[in-house]
Regions:
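Conserved acidic carboxylate
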Residues: 25
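Acidic catalytic/metal-coordinating carboxylates
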Residues: 77-80
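Two-component/phosphorelay signaling modules centered on CheY-like receiver
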Residues: 28-47
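Active-site residues of response regulator receiver
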Residues: 70
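Non-catalytic signal-transmission and effector/linker regions of two-component phosphorelay proteins
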Residues: 1-20, 104, 118-133
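Acidic, metal-coordinating helix/loop segments flanking the phosphotransfer/catalytic sites
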Residues: 48-66
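A Lys-centered signature of the CheY-like receiver
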Residues: 115
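Hydrophobic/aromatic residues positioned on beta-strands within the core alpha/beta folds
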Residues: 95-96
Length: 133
């Protein structure tokens, strides 16, 4: 991986090619970083949302195959969206600043990346979760 964010060797740059991923994050800087890293891996970003209702509408319109989600969005949770995505067999990566025990027990088995995270950890997680699709 090159040092500059968003650039990868050719083999990693196509790793997620053709996948439509959803980003749900209410912190604008983190959302932009996630979008940049996902795009650099070759995925198409269906949308980046800070509200669950907007993300749910996108899931109804688009053929989303996976999602990177914060659990808490300005006082609301993304768990309704998580349930919809899981019902469609979409893999999910939680990106959260909360402690593991703050996640409801029936969602704790889902992959989680703690904020703050670095590019290497994010790419590794994305490969494991979305690379096998």
């Amino acid at each position: 991986m090159n040092k500059r964010i968003g650039t990868y060797p050719d083999d990693e740059g196509r790793l997620l090619s053709g996948l439509k991923l959803l980003v749900v994050e209410d912190e604008a800087l983190i959302a932009m970083e996630v979008e940049e890293m996902i795009a650099a891996l070759g995925a198409e970003i269906v949308g980046s949302f800070s509200r669950v209702t907007d993300a749910l509408e996108a899931v109804e319109r688009e053929a989303v195959v996976g999602a990177i989600l914060d659990i808490q969005l300005d006082g609301a949770t993304t768990l309704t969206l998580v349930d919809v995505l899981l019902g469609r067999n979409c893999p999910i990566l939680f990106v959260t600043g909360g402690a593991p025990e703050s996640i409801p027990e029936n969602y704790r088995q889902l992959p989680r990346l703690s904020k703050p995270f670095n590019q290497v950890d994010f790419v590794r997680s994305a490969k494991l979760i979305f690379g096998r699709r």
